[in-house]
Amino acid sequence: MEKKEMMYEGKAKKVYSTEDPEKVVIYYKDDATAFNGEKKGQIEDKGVLNNNITSMLFELLEKHGVKTHFEKKLSDREQLCKKVEIVPLEVIVRNVAAGSMAKRLGLEEGYELKTTVFELSYKDDALGDPLINDTHAVAIGATTFEELDKIYAATKTVNDVLKEFFHKQGIKLIDFKIEFGRYNGEVLLADEISPDTCRLWDEKTNEKLDKDRFRRDMGNVKEAYVEILNRITGK
């Protein structure tokens, strides 16, 4: 399906309309940002790697009953997706303390949490995507309690499926953030799942295989993304 006009350009992707008003083409860029856009750069072939990783993980989740916006991969950088109305929230899932949570709560990075933590952030770059709670989200009109129930149920399944899947590849799923969209009365998993949106550590060495390598100037960023793709595809 051919793409037409560009409807939206974000930090990591471009969204194009198609001849079908219900479908869009999503193009994955090599641009990399961190700290709400304060740090910017490029990671060679990141768009290709993230498109391939996301396509595979969304297909996996669909097989486990998670409804997503993903239709099919069109090329190395493009995928066909349902046109959704994005819920203006990010759902953050934390299995191990790292990043902002470790800093905020004074925890050592790598601390094994006693239970999985679910957080919400309000998608607003100007505000720095602030953390909010469920009642905030409903009070400001971002969602409803009924919709949140569906979002949390899907999120729990995503975490359960991905934790087990990554474990089989020798990868520890530290945390991740996901987004959802509305489509014909349903709530679908949208956006992407990749080393841009997940913290992924090698189970044996705790080597970071995700965007923290870019955030923290650790080097070998592309190599880490390639390692994730190779492991999940069995190469």
UniProtKB/Swiss-Prot annotation:
Family in the record: Belongs to the SAICAR synthetase family.
EC number from the UniProt entry: 6.3.2.6
Gene name of the record: purC
GO term, biological process aspect, one: cobalamin biosynthetic process
Associated pathway: Purine metabolism; IMP biosynthesis via de novo pathway; 5-amino-1-(5-phospho-D-ribosyl)imidazole-4-carboxamide from 5-amino-1-(5-phospho-D-ribosyl)imidazole-4-carboxylate: step 1/2
Cross-referenced Pfam families: SAICAR_synt
Catalyzed reactions per annotation: 5-amino-1-(5-phospho-D-ribosyl)imidazole-4-carboxylate + L-aspartate + ATP = (2S)-2-[5-amino-1-(5-phospho-beta-D-ribosyl)imidazole-4-carboxamido]succinate + ADP + phosphate + 2 H(+)
Keywords annotated in UniProt: ATP-binding, Ligase, Nucleotide-binding, Purine biosynthesis
Entry-linked InterPro entries: SAICAR_synt/ADE2_N (IPR028923), SAICAR_synt_PurC (IPR033934), SAICAR_synth (IPR001636), SAICAR_synthetase (IPR050089), SAICAR_synthetase_CS (IPR018236)
Family matches, as SUPFAM superfamilies: SAICAR synthase-like (SSF56104)
Coiled coil: none
PANTHER family recorded: MULTIFUNCTIONAL PROTEIN ADE2, SI:DKEY-6E2.2
An MF annotation (GO) of this entry: phosphoribosylaminoimidazolesuccinocarboxamide synthase activity
EC class: ligase
Organism: Clostridium acetobutylicum (strain ATCC 824 / DSM 792 / JCM 1419 / IAM 19013 / LMG 5710 / NBRC 13948 / NRRL B-527 / VKM B-1787 / 2291 / W)
Name of the molecule in the record: Phosphoribosylaminoimidazole-succinocarboxamide synthase
Xref: NCBIfam families: purC
